[in-house]
Every structure is written in C-alpha cells, then in structure tokens.
Curated annotation (Swiss-Prot):
Annotated GO MF terms: glycine dehydrogenase (decarboxylating) activity
Organism this protein belongs to: Beijerinckia indica subsp. indica (strain ATCC 9039 / DSM 1715 / NCIMB 8712)
Annotated NCBIfam families: PRK00451.1 (NF001696)
Database matches in Gene3D superfamilies: Aspartate Aminotransferase, domain 1, Type I PLP-dependent aspartate aminotransferase-like (Major domain)
Function as written in the Swiss-Prot or TrEMBL entry: The glycine cleavage system catalyzes the degradation of glycine. The P protein binds the alpha-amino group of glycine through its pyridoxal phosphate cofactor; CO(2) is released and the remaining methylamine moiety is then transferred to the lipoamide cofactor of the H protein.
HAMAP family in UniProt: GcvPA
Keywords: Oxidoreductase
Protein name: Probable glycine dehydrogenase (decarboxylating) subunit 1
Gene from which this protein is expressed: gcvPA
Pfam families on file: GDC-P
EC number: 1.4.4.2
Subunit and partners: The glycine cleavage system is composed of four proteins: P, T, L and H. In this organism, the P 'protein' is a heterodimer of two subunits.
Swiss-Prot/TrEMBL catalytic activity: N(6)-[(R)-lipoyl]-L-lysyl-[glycine-cleavage complex H protein] + glycine + H(+) = N(6)-[(R)-S(8)-aminomethyldihydrolipoyl]-L-lysyl-[glycine-cleavage complex H protein] + CO2
GO biological process, one term: glycine decarboxylation via glycine cleavage system
Length: 447
C-alpha cells in the first residue's frame, strides 16, 4: 500500500489558505537559476555491506586518536573510560529517558542528577551545583550573564589565558545583550596584570586554571582583589581531572566555578556532546542558570527527588528567566557520575597524579631537545613549547609519521604571533614508549 502524504485537493486547499497560486510561488525569493528543477544524478542505492565498506575507506583516511600516540588537548582530552561506564549508560532506562518532569516516574534519573550535583560541588569546593550545561564554553557564557545580574554591572574581563573558543562564546552573547567584554591579550606565562583592570564597572573577572597554555594560577590574590572591588571571580577549567590534585577553585575564593567535564567518563566524541559543570555559592542560588535537582519528602514521608528552582524561560516569563538553555547534558553527566563513583576520592587523586607525572616527564625530555623552549613554570598535564619554525609544519610532519603531537597555538589564535608555539597534553593513556616516540620524532624533525 502506497503512502500518499498529500492529495491534489489537499495541495490546492493549502495554497489557497496561504494565498499563493502555486508551489513555485513559495520559492520566488530564490533566483530561478539557483532552484533545483530536476533531481540530481545521484548513484543508485547500495546494500548495507557496500555502504559499510565505503564508510570504512573514508574513515581510514583519518589518523584516529586510538591508533597513534596522542598528545592533543587544548580543551578536549583523551582519557581511559572504563567499559562499565558505557555499558551502564546504554541501559534503555537511561539512554531513552526524557526530562524528568514527572518525579513520580523518574526517581532514578533525578537521583543520579542529584548525585552528579553533589560530586560537582565537592570537586569545585562550592556549595551548590546545577544539573549541567551544554559544555564548558556555554557554562562560562552563562556565568558571565549571571555575574551581570548579581552585580548590576555590565563589563566582564576575560583573562588572556582563557580558551579562545570560550572567549568567543562570551563575546557572541555580549553582542546581543549589550554588555562590554574586555578580552586580554594572550598570556603565555600567566603574568598579566588583572587586578589593575578592575574598576567600578566590572561585574566579573574570568580566569582559567589550568589555562589554555597549561599554566596553573593561584586564585587567592585575585579573589581578594575582586572582593575589594565588588567584582565576582569566575574560575574556569577545561580539564576536570586536575581537580583531583589542584586546590579547588572554591577553596581559593572563587564566586562561580565553571568548566568542562568531558575528561571524566566521556570520550572525545568528535568534539561533543560534552558536559558543562556549573557551581556557585548558596547565596547566589536563585540566579544560577539551568536545572537544579533537590531532595525532599513525599506525602508518606519517604525521601525523594524533584526538579526545583527551574527559572528557565520554559517555566517563567522570558524576561525573568535566568537562562534560555533548554536542557542539560543528561547522559554525559551520568557517564561523569559513574566514572567518578568508580574512581572515588583516592582514585581520582591517583589518576591526577599519574597525569601530572607523565606531563612532567615529557616536558623534561622535550626541554632537553636543542631548539625547544618550555614556557611553563607550573602545570598539570598540559604545557606549551616554543619551536624553531612553524608549529603547524612540525605537527603535520609528525602526523605523517603516525604521531599526533599537539595543538598549534596558531589554530586557536590566528594572526597573534603564536605560529611557533605548540600545546602538548599527556594523560594516563600515554605510555613511556609514546612519550619517547614523540621526543625522538620531534628532535629529528627539528635537526
């Protein structure tokens, strides 16, 4: 039986309703020469086996992260994800579930969201966390908007160590909200004067640690300076594993902590989906964007979980909403929660220690290569080196040898005089042989 979605009578009635004589009239804004009159000459359909082989040939052109020594970071990190994480999140109760608007049938989802919030608050040293954002960049953008609401001021200062993609999200939002954004020049060694830029118009100071170049920052002096000026300090991170070893931003005085949670429980995923983390102090709770899961008692006095304080535009008047983000990264935050639960506090610290040790070992080896200059003094699992010549050329040459060497800074900051800089990350997945291969290949490439 054929499926006929539209009869001639249906078409005539619809055209009459919208007031046009023909279907072609609906497309009159498109130049006639640009319209597709006949179907293109596409190849005939293929069987499943043929399609799989064709796609396999295409994918074989890529140098996969799993098939080569991989030192790429700059905001997305390759970590080992236990098989149990993927197995559990693929259960249909999690994989296919929708927003838990009906708590009486969604206690499982609500409970893991509550546990996720608890873990994020503990990791960041804050008092409350939301149910996640799209990713670290959108969390940063929402944090800046939250700071504007809280302080009634309209200027944000972005550190020169903030990931350029995060800065682009903030400036894109500011173009529509009318707020001012001051983006500091690239700060390769975390030595910029941020305190001197604070004034009575500043709502927030946004500082990343570890920053995009790998530098670790002491946030306490910045937090003290911000308090004196009535400015909110927003601490950003892109590598969540660092929180297993580095002092929590909240414990250093940050007012809002945001970042990317991809490196716990989530694979690289071609750049997404990821999971944005957002935490703050209890006194700012009502201006925190996104969803919040709370614990309560039901009519029979039993412990239960519900969505609470959802001041999104779906729930209240748009002009009163704290955010127009319409969802959270539910499955990704479940993966985060499962992995972190499996690790535990000691496991996370051990994982972070291994990451740091691998990075220090690699940095020491590379610093001994003639022509290589290490720019960082303190770092976690990522650092920046200066090379003779264009870093992009060296990366391409090493990729041809089967080594993914890192991210040229010129890709993140084109035209900023950073052509000779390379960001390198080393995590627990990089073996001693991997690190030795990178050092040897780069030394030969430079010689």
């Amino acid at each position: 039986m054929r499926y006929l979605p539209l009869t001639p009578e249906d078409r005539t009635e619809m055209l009459a309703r919208v007031g046009v004589p023909s279907v072609d009239a609906l497309f009159e804004d498109i130049p006639a020469a640009k319209r597709l009159v006949e179907l293109p000459d596409l190849p005939l359909h293929k069987g499943e086996l043929e399609v799989e082989r064709w796609l396999g040939r295409l994918s074989a052109k890529n140098l996969a992260a799993s098939a080569a020594p991989f030192f790429v970071g700059a905001g997305a990190y390759k970590h080992h994800v236990p098989a149990s994480v993927d197995h559990l999140i693929q259960r249909s109760e999690f994989m296919t579930s929708y927003t838990p608007y009906q708590p009486e049938i969604a206690q499982g989802t609500l409970q893991y969201v509550f546990e996720f919030q608890t873990q994020v608050a503990a990791l960041t040293g804050m008092e409350v966390a939301n149910a996640s954002m799209y990713d670290g960049s959108t969390a940063t953008g929402e944090a800046v908007l939250m700071a504007h609401r809280l302080t009634k001021r309209g200027k944000a200062i972005l550190s020169g160590g903030l990931h350029p993609h995060y800065a682009q999200v903030v400036t894109s939002q500011a173009a529509l909200t009318g707020h001012d954004v001051v983006v500091m020049p690239p700060d390769l060694q975390a030595k910029e004067d941020l305190v001197g830029r604070l004034d009575a118009q500043t709502s927030c100071l946004v500082v990343q640690s570890p920053d995009v170049f790998g530098n670790l920052r002491d946030l306490e002096p910045l937090a003290e300076a911000c308090r004196k000026q009535g400015v909110l300090l927003i601490a950003v991170f892109t590598e969540a594993v660092s929180l297993g070893l580095v002092k929590a931003p909240g414990d250093m005085g940050a007012d809002i902590v945001v970042g990317e949670g991809q490196s716990i429980g989530n694979a690289l995923n071609f750049g997404g989906p990821y999971v944005g983390l957002f935490a703050t102090r209890s006194k700012y709770l009502r201006q925190m964007p996104g969803r919040l899961c709370g614990e309560t008692l039901d009519a029979d006095g039993r412990r239960g979980f519900v969505l609470t304080l959802s001041t999104r535009e779906q729930h209240i008047r748009r002009d009163k909403a704290t955010s127009n983000i319409c969802t959270n990264s539910g499955l990704c935050c479940l993966a985060f929660t499962i992995h972190l639960t499996l690790l535990g506090e000691q496991g996370l610290r051990q994982l972070a220690t291994i990451n740091h040790a691998h990075a220090v070992d690699l940095a020491d080896r590379l610093a001994k290569v003639p022509g290589v200059e290490l720019l960082n003094e303190t770092f976690f699992n990522e650092f920046t080196i200066r090379l003779p010549g264009r870093a992009e050329d060296h990366v391409e040459a090493l990729a041809a040898q089967g080594i993914l060497a890192g991210v040229p800074v010129s890709r993140l900051l084109p035209g900023q005089g950073c052509d000779d800089l390379l960001i390198i990350a080393s995590t627990e997945v990089n073996s001693d042989d991997d690190r030795a291969a990178l050092v040897d290949a780069l030394a030969k490439q430079i010689a």
